[in-house]
Curated annotation (Swiss-Prot):
It comes from Xenopus tropicalis. The gene is zfpl1. This is Zinc finger protein-like 1. Required for cis-Golgi integrity and efficient ER to Golgi transport. GO terms for molecular function: zinc ion binding. Its main location: Golgi.
Length: 320
């Protein structure tokens, strides 16, 4: 057992083999994340340590590390690769520490900085989220972009040659069809433009001839009214016809004074006013209580036989 040198001054049995100091779990996570840390008894038995990862045999300081609840330290990438090689239906108890065969997942009732850091790191991969009881992360499937953009079939060129004669008749048919759709007089188009000016706009396309095409767009977007302003105004001033002659409560003026009209911002004047009102009410209540108690005490004293001088045997009235 030893005392950690951090400001917390916690008693701990953990010992950093590299810096040769006692460390608590808070310092272990903050300042000794890549150090070999075990119990002080192990240090007394054997002070030698291996600074390399036991999975890839490279320095632990070269990559990101992950410390299990048994305090064994590994490269996070090596531990992740080792876990992904197991079958997807492996139970959480099947994930074991490569060094001491301890559990990889911290117990649910364990509360410590090391366990919290390990849970946060394990929650980033799917194989560990299932063991922690978290929903899996959806992995987007890569889109195959190897499809050719030009999918034109040039195998049958005879169809193009045979239909070349029919293409010459297409402009005439197209012009006739266009005339059928564009047979709207100019006056009618302008009339529709003048009528629909207030509701929706009209676009007039004029050709070289006397034909034109009028395209009426959809109605303009409706205006959205904010009902919160109306509700806010009702809270501030209530002066409707139905409520104008309604009987108000007796203490409505007091509630109106005590209510904070400025929202979260309180003015000094309103605070002083509320304080004075509360003070006056308190004084009036105190005086009323004193008056009531005095009347009740006098009434009880008048009816008390012990205070009646005629009933006192030691007092003789009208006798010599």
């Amino acid at each position: 057992m030893g005392l950690c040198k951090c400001p917390k001054r916690k008693v701990t049995n953990l010992f950093c083999f590299e810096h040769r100091v006692n460390v608590c779990e808070h310092c272990l996570v903050a300042n000794h994340a890549k150090c070999i840390v075990q119990s002080y008894l192990q240090w007394l038995q054997d002070s030698d340590y291996n600074p390399n990862c036991r999975l890839c045999n490279t320095l632990l300081s070269s990559k990101e590390t992950a410390r299990l609840v048994c305090y064994d330290l590994f490269h996070w990438s090596c531990l992740n690769d080792l876990a992904t090689q197991l079958p997807p239906n492996t139970a959480p108890a099947g994930y074991r520490c490569p060094s001491c065969q301890g559990p990889v997942f911290p117990p649910s009732n364990l509360v410590s900085p090391v366990a919290a850091t390990l849970r946060e790191k394990l929650s980033t991969v799917n194989w560990a989220r299932a063991g922690l009881g978290l929903p899996l992360i959806e992995v987007a499937e890569p889109v195959d972009d190897t499809m050719s953009h030009d999918e034109t079939d040039y195998r049958d060129w005879s169809v193009v040659n045979s239909s070349s004669d029919n293409l010459s008749e297409t402009p005439e048919t197209t012009s006739q069809t266009g005339y059928a759709y564009n047979s709207v007089p100019t006056s009618v188009a302008q009339h529709s433009l003048n009528v629909n000016m207030s509701q929706d706009h009209a676009v007039t396309i004029r050709d070289t001839g006397s034909d034109s095409l009028t395209i009426n767009a959809g109605s303009s977007p409706r205006k959205v009214y904010d009902t919160r302003e109306t509700a806010r105004g009702q809270d501030a001033v209530i002066d409707f016809d139905d409520d104008k002659y309604r009987r108000r409560p007796t203490l409505s003026w007091l509630a109106r004074i005590l209510r904070n009209r400025s929202g979260s911002k309180s003015r000094p004047a309103s605070s002083m006013q509320r304080f004075l009102v509360i003070l006056i009410i308190g004084v009036l209540g105190f005086l009323t209580l004193i008056l009531l108690m005095s009347k009740l005490g006098r009434a009880s004293a008048d009816n008390d036989p012990n205070l009646d001088p005629l009933l006192n045997p030691h007092i003789h009235v009208g006798k010599e």
